Amino acid sequence: MKLVLLLAGFAALAKCSLAAPAGVQKDIPMETSAPEKPSEATTLGLLKTPKPEPKDEEPSPGAFQGDMMLTDDQLRKVEEAIDDQKAGRKKRKATIYESQRWSYKIIPYVIESSSSGQSSLIRSAMDHWEQNTCLRFEPLTSSHSSRLGHTSYISFFRGNGCWSHVGRSFTNQQQISIGPQCGYFGTIVHEIGHAIGFHHEQSRPDRDEYINVHFENVQSGREHNFAKYTWGSVTSSNVEYDVGSIMHYGGYGFSSNGRPTITTIDPRLNSRLGQRTALSAADIELANRIYECDDVEDCSNADECLNGGYHDADCDCVCPSSYSGDLCQDGGPTVRPADCSYRFTEMTGEITSPNYPSNYEDNTACVYEIEGPYGSTIELTFLDMEIETETLCRYDAVEVRKDDINSIGEKFCGNTLPPVQISSSNQMMVSFTSDPSITRRGFKATYVIIIQTTTVFSTTTLQTTPPSTTTLQTTNPSTTTLQTTNPSTTTLQTTDTPVIGSCGGTFVGVEGRVASPNYPNDYDNSLQCDYVIEVDDGRRVELIFEDFGLEDETTCRWDSLMINLGNGIKVGMKMCGREYPAASLVSIGNRMELKLKTDGSVNDRGFVASYRAIDL
């Protein structure tokens, strides 16, 4: 039986659009040969071409991850890093590629005759790096070897595809291929990034905090393009992960079915994936840190950059996205995309696209989070929809994440009302995005939070002094005893035998205990442990936490324990920190599932819980 609580609630949504990144204003040559999206007058929304994936993602023969030519030693180190990441081994010493940086921050180059027609574009891409870092690109001369202490140089040529070697890898010529399809400013900037030592951004081990990789949509045999490295094998210099990095894959690279292979956890940021317009602020900061640019340029007398900005090679402030001004003093939270972010906790409510029922604006990105009490579910009903039509909803769309709000959801567009959406937990995320052209009326929807009355809490007591009772064997090495006092009341008693933790497992029987790996010592990094507790048909699982300690974060996105009460209903919390339910949790059916996930840093003691089979 469901008890639907209807309370008055209405959320008025204000107009919001995604702010363009701001920062140092430079004369950056813009890409002119990229395909333009046709206007509504010529296409009526039916023939538009989706945003193309970066050309550097198209696989070149012999290249790793599409466009990186690695030496045998580099490939061995990368494969070791990937194997270490998969096996959860401790990090190796960071060796990538400090010895392969360009000495004195000078990179000699030649443009071969085959690329003479692209020389202006290539020079513009090098200028872009020079304008924002302390790196200098110099035409190769006979004096370079004596000045720099090596004979290495990069050579641009018209090869087969878009690719580059990584770092200073050879003692003489080091080629960068700018093939016929690669004549784009951003693509050349990307390949130069590899030459100075950058790997792809999505290879970082902390990527799962920012993006989801959808291997189910990846072409068979191309999965290695999405492998992660260990921290010991990347050079991040404490620069935050950046979905807008010019070194990041786009959203549809290596797709087998036209669906995304990468999405951002924050759906408002999906449009930043694969940008090849210019270096991002994080790209610039990373280059300046690994080449120690601030040690070369004396900016000690320059005014301090505000709001996380930093000095470039010319002592100008480079500002984070949404900040501007000489010192990054302008903008900020009032113009950030988060302004179009709404959270609903009332039992009923209404959500609409910005400006509804008038047309929404171009380049809109909004998120609506709905959260109910633990154990509840959410039903979302669309009342009106008029959104630009495209088969896969790649232009404008409303997306509903009804299972895992950090994963990909189902997209809707056009004029057909979607079916009622029902969440599997107490959380649902709805996002709305639009592209740079063609707008419509948008959408209107209402939601109701539903309380499941079948989730009840029975009363139990834990005792540490075991009486003389019958001993039952459980699936783990600890021993528990069950004493029956009368048909309606049972007392669960636990021996003093320490519980032995595990990374997942299946637990059956009348009662037992589960614990995280190494408990009560700290668990390891990079874990995913699945625990299944199952009792006889017709009975329920009752779970009581005895101790709990996981890395704390507001949304539990780093380390977490997720509990599924069965029958598609999830307890609506990713538990973390030191707080846990004081009452017992009872499954909907005869099965309960726990999922422990940890990231690549910061540990805690984990958890231990007792379970038993009960009758309701």
Swiss-Prot record:
Source domain of life is Eukaryota
* Matching SMART domains: CUB, ZnMc
Q: Which UniProt keywords apply?
A: Cleavage on pair of basic residues, Developmental protein, Disulfide bond, EGF-like domain, Hydrolase, Metal-binding, Metalloprotease, Protease, Repeat, Signal, Zinc
Residues binding Zn(2+) are: 190, 194, 200
Q: Which residues form the EGF-like domain?
A: 289-329
Leader peptide range in chain numbering = 1-16
Active-site positions on this chain: 191
Specify whether Protease is a keyword of the entry: yes
Enzyme Commission (EC) number: 3.4.24.-
Q: What's the protein name?
A: Protein SpAN
